[in-house]
């Protein structure tokens, strides 16, 4: 399950990203680390995402998170660009990567498995649809922990 602070963090981060021509792709708050780590992946909408994009976003976001007191106590802010193994989260990404190999991880076993590798067919309101060597499968969305591009088809 996503951390309960993530919606507030996203609400704070998205306007800053938009102002810089960036898009927030993924937000993860790892509270099992000391100090906790807030990792935000951003993508430049007009060109390859560079270190400068991440630095500018981080410098503008950090004071806003502090001012709004969203995260209590000390934490580490990591801003990076999504790699090829990034999580697919938006409708746009699921459309753009239709036909690509993906890895789906579930919170609980579905048909006795917690990890599925196949070709992305689509995502709808109810499920993530994959093609597994010619066989179609629909994994209920409420069970899906993450969907990543898979570089090992």
From Swiss-Prot:
- Record-linked Gene3D superfamilies: Ribosome maturation factor RimP, C-terminal domain, RimP-like superfamily, N-terminal
| UniProt entry tagged with the keyword Signal | no
Could you tell me the Gene Ontology terms of the biological process aspect for this record? ribosomal small subunit assembly; translation
Signal peptide feature range: none
| Keyword RNA-binding attached | no
Q: Name one GO cellular component term.
A: cytosol
Keyword vocabulary terms for this entry: Cytoplasm, Ribosome biogenesis
Note the InterPro entries from the entry.
Ribosome_maturation_RimP, RimP_C, RimP_C_sf, RimP_N, RimP_N_sf
Q: Which SUPFAM superfamilies does the annotation name? A: YhbC-like, C-terminal domain (SSF74942), YhbC-like, N-terminal domain (SSF75420)
Q: The organism sits in which domain of life?
A: Bacteria
Which is a Pfam family this sequence falls into?
A: RimP_N
Q: Where in the cell is it found?
A: Cytoplasm
The record's listing under CDD domains reads:
YlxS_C
Family classification: Belongs to the RimP family.
Q: Explain the purpose of this protein.
A: Required for maturation of 30S ribosomal subunits.
Give the NCBIfam families listed for this entry.
PRK00092.3-3
What HAMAP family does its record include?
A: RimP (MF_01077)
* PANTHER family to which the protein is assigned, alphabetical: RIBOSOME MATURATION FACTOR RIMP
User: What name has this protein been given in UniProt?
Assistant: Ribosome maturation factor RimP
Organism field: Picosynechococcus sp. (strain ATCC 27264 / PCC 7002 / PR-6) (Agmenellum quadruplicatum)
